[in-house]
Amino acid sequence: MSDNGQNSASPHIPVMLADVLDVLKPRDGGVYVDGTFGAGGYTRAILGSADCAVLAIDRDPTAILRGRALATEFAGRLTLIEGRFGDMKRLVRELGHGTVDGVVLDIGVSSMQLDQAERGFSFQQDGPLDMRMGGEGPSAADVVNHFDEADLARIIAVYGEEKRARAVARAIVAARQTAELHRTLELADLVASVIHRKPQDRIHPATRTFQALRIFVNDELGELARGLSGAEDLLHEGGRLAVVAFHSLEDRIVKRFLTARTGRAGRANRYMPERDEVAPSFREIAHKAMKASEEEVEINVRARSAKLRAAERTAAPALPLDLAALGFRAVPTLDGSLA
């Protein structure tokens, strides 16, 4: 995810690339999954460091189209897959791969998507209020124009961690009585009229609302949970997982997932009964999240908020996915609220 100010870098620079390669340790003959292909930065580096193969997944058809040149450059070693990384287990197995050697995920919206006003992700450029990464399903405009006030407030509070979510939702509902909201700057200006920017504020008043709508429209947190579970199923013993997250919402999910699967979860408190002993499906590569160096942050501002968590697969069976244990909270559903 780009930094909260939406100061995207162009061309796209893969964050913590050297650290990711050090985690994955690509080897000749290996098969690796880049679940968030984007501009192909991680994929290119993996293919360039060993005579291996990469299965690159992206739900954005424009990313797949741009990736064709890279597939030509690394003929026979790069397979481009249009789809969601949350479905990686099915997508990879359909290609005949039972297991893989490594998985890398770079979570959130890409700087390229922010730079394209017509995609509707940016509150700094005027464009259609869309925000769909893959172009399918209801758009952000559908959400702001059809969800009731309580549902909008819940989405903005949970996914944007916006303290004034109720006031923002109230303003949206009032504004659409006169005219529906269909442009990004319309919504950004409306939110700014509710959340007045203070001189010391580092982020735009609409940052959290736009983040919440984007996460909701694309089911980003559900996608992340399913992707982590899919990686757990696909990685063979010794296979490695590297996840780069830019926001606390995503990083908390990754942390909880790996904490549970490395055997560090323990009891929630001393009054809870002991859990049955379960063999850890991952072992830690680093106890804490890794952060970008000061030198990298100077070159690439996106790296400022990046956290890399990594683990190595054990021989133990994969554990069932438990969304509640990952901290998921109840929110409206796209289908239910738009029906």
Curated annotation (Swiss-Prot):
Organism: Parvibaculum lavamentivorans (strain DS-1 / DSM 13023 / NCIMB 13966)
Source species, domain of life: Bacteria
Major place of residence: cytoplasm
Top-tier EC class: transferase
UniProt keyword list: Cytoplasm, Methyltransferase, rRNA processing, S-adenosyl-L-methionine, Transferase
Catalyses which reaction(s): cytidine(1402) in 16S rRNA + S-adenosyl-L-methionine = N(4)-methylcytidine(1402) in 16S rRNA + S-adenosyl-L-homocysteine + H(+)
Function comment: Specifically methylates the N4 position of cytidine in position 1402 (C1402) of 16S rRNA.
Protein name stated in the entry: Ribosomal RNA small subunit methyltransferase H
Keyword Metal-binding assigned: no
InterPro entries membership: RsmH, SAM-dep_MeTrfase_MraW_recog, SAM-dependent_MTases_sf
GO BP, sorted A to Z: rRNA base methylation
Transmembrane segments: none
